[in-house]
Design a protein with these regions (language model features):
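Phosphate-binding loop of NTP-binding sites
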Residues: 1-111, 116-127
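Short intrinsically disordered, low-complexity coil segments enriched in acidic
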Residues: 1-7, 55, 70, 142-143, ...
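Acidic, Mg2+-coordinating active-site environments of NTP-dependent enzymes
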Residues: 78-192
Length: 199
């Protein structure tokens, strides 16, 4: 199962959390680090050995026309849309135009996972892919019970993905931090530092 993951934020965290919660006996490949550009996705695909049950490929865009190329390369069985925000907005006339570009990842994907809280993405997905695709709204599952909204939504996406794959909800208690993404570190004088340098 090839999984394409896109969104303004959360691509790498969702990818890493899926990888960290993979059931025993399921061989999984994931694109390294944040390899989500045209070149990064192509390099990731070349690393797949072929006997994996799940291959997680990030797809990031910054310009119009990029997602059509990524969709042809990745050809996902499952498309995951993590979020919709203002990243790379300067290259698009409107949020809707950027959203339409991102939605191209799911053009031929039989199954689509998204979070209903992100508009206009959720409405556009339901309208554009109403037929011929199975849509799964992650807002309808419990998630991991995280205190911050971004982590909770990411956990709901991960849980929904595993349910789509016919697996039970994962145990989020064993998750390890993803480097430079809300990573909590010990500081001096009994302080805590939150390293979100990547974002």
């Amino acid at each position: 199962t090839v999984v394409g993951i896109t969104g303004s934020n959360g691509k790498t965290v969702v990818k890493e959390w899926i990888a960290q919660t993979v059931p025993a006996g399921v061989k999984l490949f994931r694109s390294p680090r944040s390899y989500n550009s045209q070149l990064g996705a192509a390099l990731s695909l070349l690393m797949i050995e072929g006997d994996e049950k799940v291959a997680l490929i990030e797809a990031g865009i910054s310009l119009p026309g990029e997602m059509a190329r990524l969709e042809r390369m990745i050809s996902p069985d499952v498309a995951i849309f993590t979020s919709l925000g203002d990243a790379h907005q300067e290259h698009f006339a409107s949020l809707e135009e950027k959203c339409a570009e991102k939605l191209l990842l799911a053009l031929h994907a039989p199954k689509i996972v998204y979070h209903g809280v992100y508009e206009p993405m959720a409405s556009m997905l339901r309208e554009v892919y109403a037929e011929g695709h199975e849509l799964y709204d992650a807002a309808k599952v419990a998630g991991g019970g995280f205190a911050d909204a971004a982590s909770e939504r990411n956990s709901q996406l991960v849980e929904t993905f595993w349910r789509v794959m016919g697996r039970p909800a994962p145990d989020f208690g064993q998750l390890q931090p993803v480097a430079m993404r809300l990573e909590v570190k010990e500081g001096i004088n009994d302080s805590l530092l939150v390293d979100d340098a990547y974002n």
